[in-house]
UniProtKB/Swiss-Prot annotation:
Residues 806-840, 911-930 are annotated as: Disordered. Pfam families: HEAT_2, PC_rep, RPN2_C, RPN2_N. GO terms for molecular function: endopeptidase activity; enzyme regulator activity; ubiquitin protein ligase binding. GO terms for cellular component: nucleus; proteasome regulatory particle, base subcomplex; proteasome storage granule. Acts as a regulatory subunit of the 26S proteasome which is involved in the ATP-dependent degradation of ubiquitinated proteins. Residues 812-840 have a biased composition (Basic and acidic residues). The lineage of its organism: Eukaryota, Fungi, Dikarya, Ascomycota, Saccharomycotina. This is 26S proteasome regulatory subunit RPN2.
């Protein structure tokens, strides 16, 4: 018979006899889930029994109290009493109560463990620890290793993680679990110190295995930025004669590791024997040479677009001249082709002052990566040459930095000498411009090198307190010390930002602090808080960029909340715009959510917020072709405010870079819109500037580069690309900084090189999809019927009406007398083509995997969307040393028949070394003063 009331049992609890009370508790425990509402009235009496140390069944009383609180929904109290029940609480019991308590216990433990991490004395209840560990053991016993590892990572229990991994009997299983932990550690673990400890532990486990996953080890090295670990890895690979994998990892490090790590690694390996080729690869010279060769050989530069822009935008106006200079630089980025500059010396001569500085620096983008001949190319414009203009001298030093960006070992000494020699005269106008270029140049060349020598040299320029050179010196320091978080440097920058009277320097220092805290996540919180609360607008502006860079790619909820709050509450428009822009950086890895988050902001009454929305979408979705982002941006291209239209057009070009008309139908419309804005005399200057720069971006690198923000093989952010974008967005204040976008350009190619000689063989691999989908968009052509339009406009309206009436009455299709047969034929062909294009269903352009394939030649254009359809047949002569998983860049190949002859592709450097001397660089005539 079921019990319908607990009253008799509750009455027994008031008896003096402990045996009777125990009986009552046992009975209540069996019915408490049904009668909890009645029993809860006497909860204080049951709690008193638990607190009575003389009562033998006090733990049972705790269990009953726990069940009452569970039914009341008071889970924290329920867990507390369940822990007090000790052995009476059976975690193996199959009930909703036990499942809930265990789940709540784990959550409580994780919360307490994360709060107490790093503290000497833990404040966690031992019973809570016991339940947590018993549940983990239960997972391990059941073979649920990933679940156990996930919980251990969330609770910062490194000991549990290492125990699970080291107790695996099978190395393949261990490697799978290590990969899981590595991905989780680099993407979800938010505590930097714990993340570092995990990665070091994983390195130690991996390096001791009989058959380690060396590529996983390289990922750990990049995340830790530790050259000593890298040296250990290469020593092991060389000692095992595993040179093919060593070369592949070296190429990977060149594109993903910091310059500081590479410099230290080269210095270490240079002392050993048999490391010459590794040292050469790690210098970055082969990679840059390969990319220059690809970009030069495959360039599809649409010069008619540039000429159209040049003729539509009067070079006498600095704004327009700068726009065409930047657009030209982007279109030719890395191709080493400066024919447009040579052919338009008279137009270049129109440049005045800082437009001349920008135009000279643009040569650095065109020759970017030319590490062997870069200085020789810029020589005619460098200080000490015949160039008379201070803007040419300063621009050439900036251009030198752009050529050697991230690989500046050979040029840093020269740039440092220029700074040291001139820093004492920083207040002189001529020297000020020169130091401005030199400071930006050395910052680029020494990016992330953490060089104290560069810092000390730039500090002298900064403290001279001259606006132009001081602001550039601040940025140079930030770039050099990128991501270091150096406390001494940070203190110097923050203190001087409050002392200087120059707004430009304050803003430069604020951005430098953001660069200093790149990737530091919660370690930057104190700096962010201090800057956000500052009364100076420039410091708050720097604060949101510090959030952007410190939390770049983390999708941190806290960071997003802070930015959204600033975006709607700050009193300064610049800060609000920057705050919305910063959302794009934080959400790089979660880019699909950005359109939804900023959609309402894109309709804000404040044009600066709308502008920030455009930049946020451009940053997060760069190179992705995301339709949702395009849908938000399209209305902004018709915004009534000119700078909003400017930002929208630039953002669209960043999103649609390397998209074809078949992979994204918007490409044609956007290109046409950009041309129309540039040609329209009634458009405001800022909108035309944006359209011209956007045209350069969408056609960048001879249509052979994209903006790639992640290193797919390493699972890390592409630091150069992220920093390039962050600095590019500063063009709002200073147009020369637009050149920084070139750091974000990644060549869209897969370059296979032979492992034994690093030469590029001519061979092909397979692409398993429909041929023609990824072809270059067609070149721009002037309308064929342009001349016909001129005739048509000359015809009187009365004549036209008479012809129309005559045509209607005859009801025939007679040819109009002012049009030839050839013209009619061309018009009909164009109309038929348009009708055919309109009839083509969208399904035809969907990219699908096919069992059939077409061949793609080595070192040719392979766009990001195409990579997943690329395959290297196993039975071919050349196969990758690492399993190909759809990544671009340099791939080391095994040659099955190395003794057989094969045709190889000569690189730009090899051509110059063997066939001809370096051509003499052209000089702009003195009478043009450029």
């Amino acid at each position: 018979m079921s019990v319908i009331t607990a009253a008799p049992l509750l009455a027994l609890l008031r008896e003096d006899d402990h045996t009777v009370k125990s009986y009552a508790l046992h009975s209540i425990n069996e019915v408490v889930d049904q009668l909890w509402s009645e029993v809860s009235n006497d909860i204080t009496d049951i709690e008193a029994l638990y607190e009575d140390s003389k009562f033998e069944d006090r733990k049972l009383a705790a269990l009953v109290v726990s069940k009452i609180y569970y039914n009341l929904g008071e889970y924290e109290s329920a867990v507390r009493y369940a822990l007090a029940a000790e052995e009476y609480f059976d975690i193996n019991e199959k009930s909703r109560y036990v499942e809930t308590i265990v789940s709540q216990s784990i959550e409580m433990y994780i919360k307490l463990a994360t709060e107490n991490y790093g503290k000497e004395k833990s404040e966690i209840d031992l019973q809570l620890v016991s339940i947590f560990e018993r549940m983990l053991n239960k997972c391990i016993t059941a073979g649920e290793y990933k679940l156990a590892l996930g919980i251990a990572l969330e609770s910062y229990r490194l000991d549990v993680v290492t125990n699970i991994l080291t107790q695996q009997t099978s190395e393949p299983n261990m490697l799978k679990l290590i990969t899981y932990v590595l991905i989780a550690a680099t993407t979800t673990v938010s505590n930097t110190h714990f993340k570092i400890n995990i990665l070091y532990a994983l390195f130690d486990i991996l390096i001791r295995l009989k058959a380690p996953d060396y590529f996983a080890v390289s990922k750990i090295i990049v995340n830790l930025n530790d050259s000593k670990l890298a040296a250990r890895l290469f020593d092991k690979l060389v000692s095992e004669k595993n040179t093919e994998i060593a070369y592949q990892i070296a190429f990977d490090l060149v594109t993903s590791a910091s310059q500081g790590l590479l410099n230290e690694l080269v210095a270490t390996l240079s002392t050993g024997e048999g490391n010459d080729r590794l040292v050469e690869i790690l210098s970055g010279l082969p990679t840059c040479d390969f990319y220059n060769t690809f970009l030069h050989a495959n360039k599809r530069i649409d010069r008619s677009l540039l000429n159209k822009s040049k003729s539509s935008m009067d070079g006498k106006f600095s704004l327009f001249h700068t726009a065409v200079s930047v657009s030209n630089a982007f279109m030719h980025a890395g191709t080493t082709d400066d024919t447009f500059v040579r052919a338009n010396l008279q137009w270049l001569g129109k440049a005045q002052n800082w437009a001349k500085f920008t135009a000279t620096a643009s040569l650095g983008i065109i020759h970017q990566g030319n590490l062997t001949g870069g200085k020789k190319i810029m020589e005619p414009y460098l200080p000490g040459s015949r160039a008379s203009s201070r803007y040419i001298k300063g621009g050439s030093l900036y251009g030198l930095g752009l050529i050697y960006a991230g690989y500046g070992k050979e040029i840093i000494g020269y740039l440092k000498d220029q700074i040291v020699e001139n820093s004492s005269n920083a207040t002189d106008d001529d020297v000020d411009v020169l130091l401005h270029g030199a400071s930006l140049g050395i910052g680029l060349a020494g990016m992330s090198s953490n060089s104290t020598e560069i810092f000390e040299a730039l500090k002298e320029v900064l403290y001279a307190d001259s606006a132009n050179s001081g602001a550039a010196a601040a940025l140079g320091i930030g770039l050099t010390m990128l991501g270091s978080g150096d406390e001494t440097v940070a203190e110097n920058l923050y203190t001087y930002a409050q002392e200087t009277s120059h707004g430009e320097i304050t803003k430069g220092l604020a951005i430098a602090l953001a660069l200093l805290n790149y990737g530091r996540e919660e370690l930057a919180d104190e700096t962010i808080k201090k800057m956000l609360e500052h009364e100076n607008d420039s410091m708050r502006y720097g604060a949101v960029y510090t959030i952007a860079l410190a939390y770049a790619g983390t999708s941190s909820n806290e960071a997003v909340k802070k930015l959204l709050h600033v975006a709607v509450s700050d009193s300064n428009d610049d800060v609000r715009r920057a705050s919305v822009t910063a959302l794009g950086f934080v959400l790089i890895r979660d880019y699909t959510t950005v359109p939804r988050i900023v959609e309402l902001l894109s309709e804000s009454h404040n044009p600066h917020v709308r502008c920030g929305t455009a930049f946020a979408l451009g940053v997060a979705c760069a190179g992705r072709g995301l339709q949702a982002a395009i849908d938000v941006l399209e209305p902004l291209t018709n915004d009534p405010v000119d700078f909003v239209r400017q930002a929208a057009m630039i953002a669209l070009s960043m999103i649609l870079i390397q998209q074809t008309e078949k992979t994204n139908v918007k490409v044609r419309d956007v290109n046409e819109q950009l041309r129309n804005v540039i040609a329209n005399k009634h458009q405001e200057g800022l909108a035309k500037f944006g359209a011209c720069v956007a045209q350069g971006i969408i056609n960048a690198g001879g249509r052979n580069v994209t903006i790639q923000l992640e290193n797919s093989e390493m699972g890390t952010l592409n630091t150069k690309s992220v920093i390039g974008l962050a600095m590019f967005t500063q063009f709002w204040y200073w147009f020369p900084l637009a050149h920084f976008l070139s750091l974000s350009f990644t060549p869209t190619t897969t370059i296979g090189v032979r492992s034994h000689d690093l030469k590029i063989p001519k061979f092909s691999f397979h692409c398993h999809t429909k041929e023609g989908i990824f072809d270059y968009p067609p070149m721009f052509e002037e309308d064929i019927d342009k001349s016909i339009e001129k005739v048509a406009t000359a015809v009187l309206s009365t004549t036209a009406k008479a012809k129309a009436r005559a045509k209607k009455s005859k009801k025939d299709k007679a040819v109009e007398p002012d049009k030839s047969k050839e013209e009619i034929k061309v018009e009909n062909e164009q109309r038929d083509k348009k009708e055919h294009d309109a009839d083509v269903p969208e399904e035809e352009f969907k990219i699908k995997y096919t069992s059939t394939y077409y061949k793609v030649e080595n070192m040719t254009r392979v766009v990001p969307q195409q990579l997943k359809y690329i395959a290297f047949p196993k039975d071919e002569r050349f196969t990758p040393v690492r399993k190909f998983k759809g990544s671009n860049g340099v791939i080391v190949l095994s040659d099955k028949t190395p003794d057989e002859p094969v045709e190889v592709i000569k690189t730009v450097r090899q051509e110059k070394e063997t066939d001809a001397p370096l051509p003499a660089p052209f000089k702009v005539q003195d009478d043009l003063e450029f």
